[in-house]
Amino acid sequence: KEMKKLNKNIYVKLLRVSGVYFEGNANNEMITRIVGKSFENQEDLDKYNEFLIDAKERDHRKIGQELDLFCFSDYVGPGLPLYTPRGTIVKDELQKEIERVCRKYGFQKVSCPSLADISLFETSGHAMKFNDELFRVNSPKGHEFVLKPVQCPHHTQIYASKLRSYKDLPIRYMESDKQYRAELQGAVGGLSRVYAITVEDGHSFCTREQVKQEVINMCNLIKDFYSNMGLWNDHWVSLSVRDYEHPEKYIGSKEDWDICEQMLKEVSDELGLNAKRCEGEAALYGPKLDFMFKDALGRDIQIPTVQLDFAMPK
């Protein structure tokens, strides 16, 4: 019933029909969204149907419930997972291993509050670029705060809290803490897209001359950890660069971007990462190396990232 033969070469699989607000704005009219996939032959369609059955059995939400690892509550809200005692053990053990590897590569653990004054994110540029993704909190006296969507602005303030000498560099901080993003409700699901997620974040403050070695250090850290997890040989790397036709989307000078992109290319070549150049995939403040790993169904999932940022320190 879900497959209709349009002609001798095209087959369609209807996946779902749902209502959605136009442009994601609840004040707009609700329209119907139809999601499907087309195939050139019956064999490809049959393979896809088998994939869907396999995906349903391997769905982490189903496995998480069966193994009693996490749950959700309508009272708590969607996109806000609750880890059970068993799930918390798994989560804590992973966190301990990540912190152990980070210390091995010279990172010092820090701890920052979940809230920050809105001015911090106005200065960093996040308030302008990600305005719709910020959870804003007003104090009884009307003072505006933000639940942190990233950790980097906080870490810059630890670095800036006292005078530093170039002899102290590089200085490496790491933190394991919650980050908050106001995702579109229709996009929230399971543990893959949530409002609050624990992120292991590391930042290295260094001179320009030290940047390349710091990137290499972080890439080796990633290889170390994911090798321990048995995942390293099933991945590929994206050299995520800017969209050259829309420079207004990014912070920083063209010269700095050119330097950063070339440096990441050199690191990829030297470490044998064979990074694939992906235009338009950079963050607003710099290019990056995105490490893509395969899940149990062969889908690419971005997990760790090495990000260069010349803009925020300024």
Predicted regions mapped to residue ranges:
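Metal-assisted phosphate- and nucleotidyl-transfer catalytic regions
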Residues: 1, 230-301
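Active-site lining segments that contact anionic ligands and/or coordinate catalytic metals
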Residues: 9, 29-31, 132, 142-144, ...
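Generic secondary-structure signature for well-ordered alpha-helical cores
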Residues: 57, 207, 220-227, 265, ...
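Hydrophobic alpha-helical membrane-association signature
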Residues: 94, 214-218, 260
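Conserved alpha/beta enzyme-core scaffolds, especially Rossmann-like or related mixed alpha/beta domains
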Residues: 64-88, 193-254, 279
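Auxiliary tRNA-acceptor-end handling modules of aminoacyl-tRNA synthetases
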Residues: 1-183, 188, 192, 204, ...
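A translation/RNA-centric and nucleic-acid-associated enzymatic feature enriched
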Residues: 137, 143-144, 153-162, 171, ...
